A protein has these predicted regions:
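DPxDG-like acidic metal-binding loop motif
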Residues: 103-128
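Glycine/charged-rich beta-loop-alpha catalytic/anionic-binding loops adjacent to active sites
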Residues: 89-101
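Short aromatic/hydrophobic contact patches that present stacked aromatics
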Residues: 104, 280-282
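Gly/Ser-rich catalytic/binding loops embedded in alpha/beta enzyme cores
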Residues: 30
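C-terminal nucleotide
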Residues: 1-13, 17-19, 26, 35-83, ...
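Glycine-rich nucleotide-binding loop
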Residues: 90, 276-278
Length: 311
């Protein structure tokens, strides 16, 4: 048996604006992961995949649907990249994940990264981050249509990064980040929120461009605060970025409630993370304030609360 895992992620700054050429900053969430197990099966020919979180078992050559196609393609592309004949393999794959689906934490990219790593390793090839990221980006295109490339990159490398149109700069943090993540319990439909912003942009490009420019300034100032280890400044910038996302119309009443609850409980700053419309928010905290903020988010209706320290 071969086992591999992958982290999830949150975007600190730059959602939506990144699609229009502005930068973004994202960090891995190492404590919330997906796993893949691959076993050689001697009694059967073909590749059988068990996706526990989907409640589905299917074969690689089964007729695809929108749920299983990304996983089928992840396996198929990995095997082809390593120059193995797909039809000659007899494998059983099991997938499980703690990453909530459709919440802006990169669940699809996380599962796909664990999957390509496990398949590659089982076929005697340790997948380097660049290879894994490239393979998972193909999966992201199936999942999201026009992905930014952030999810597959930050998850494959499991490092904080600055990103713009394929350009990546890995960040060295001045001090660890303590992040509390609250799940609103409502799915975030990235395609829908991206389409909403596109409609706004087409209707009033000057106003939306100005918002994107303001978000870009948050990104660059946030990057500087991260590298200098300045959590007070960083927290203020997170809250500013949230206000700009509200102006784009991609927040929700539930997300705003959680953001305010975190701030009242002592968070240095808080914002939605990911596509918005649902999904998750994050709060920056001093370590000693993490328990109080976590409890405040639960009391405000968060479905789940996660804590991660980013170094």
């Amino acid at each position: 048996m071969t086992i591999a895992s992958a982290a999830s992620k949150v975007i600190l700054f730059g959602e939506h604006a990144v699609v229009y050429g502005r930068p973004a900053v994202a960090v891995p969430v190492s404590e919330v992961r997906a796993w893949a197990e691959v076993t050689t099966v001697l009694s059967d020919r073909g590749i059988l995949i068990h996706a526990e979180d989907l409640g589905r078992s299917f074969r690689l050559d089964d007729p695809p649907d929108e749920t299983i196609l990304p996983l089928q393609e992840a396996v198929r592309n990995t095997v082809r990249t390593l120059h193995f004949p797909v039809e000659a393999l007899s494998l059983e794959v099991r997938l499980r994940s703690r990453v909530p689906m459709a919440r802006g934490m990169g669940s699809g990219a996380s599962v796909a990264t664990a999957l390509v790593r496990a398949v590659g390793k089982h076929l005697c090839h340790d997948m380097d981050p660049a290879q894994a990221s490239a393979l998972v980006f193909q999966v992201e295109r199936i999942l999201h249509g026009t992905p930014s490339g952030i999810d597959n990159t930050v998850i494959a490398y499991e490092k904080p990064l600055w990103y713009r149109q394929g350009e990546v700069i890995f960040l060295r943090l001045g001090e660890p980040l303590h992040l509390v993540i609250g799940d609103s319990g409502t799915p975030s439909r990235t395609r829908d929120t991206v389409a909403h912003v596109r409609t706004q942009y087409q209707a009033d490009p000057a106003t939306v461009e100005a918002i994107f420019d303001a978000i870009a300034r948050c990104v660059e100032a946030g990057r500087e605060a991260l590298e200098q280890g300045n959590p007070i400044t960083l927290g203020g910038l997170l809250s500013e970025n949230h206000a700009l996302l509200q102006r784009l119309g991609v927040s929700s009443e539930k997300l705003d409630t959680l953001v305010m609850a975190a701030r009242r409980a002592g968070a240095l700053g808080a914002k939605l993370t990911g596509g918005g419309g649902g999904g998750c928010m994050l709060a920056l905290a001093f370590e000693e304030d993490v328990p109080a903020i976590s409890e405040a988010l639960k009391a405000a209706g968060a479905q789940n609360v996660y804590y991660t320290m980013v170094m």
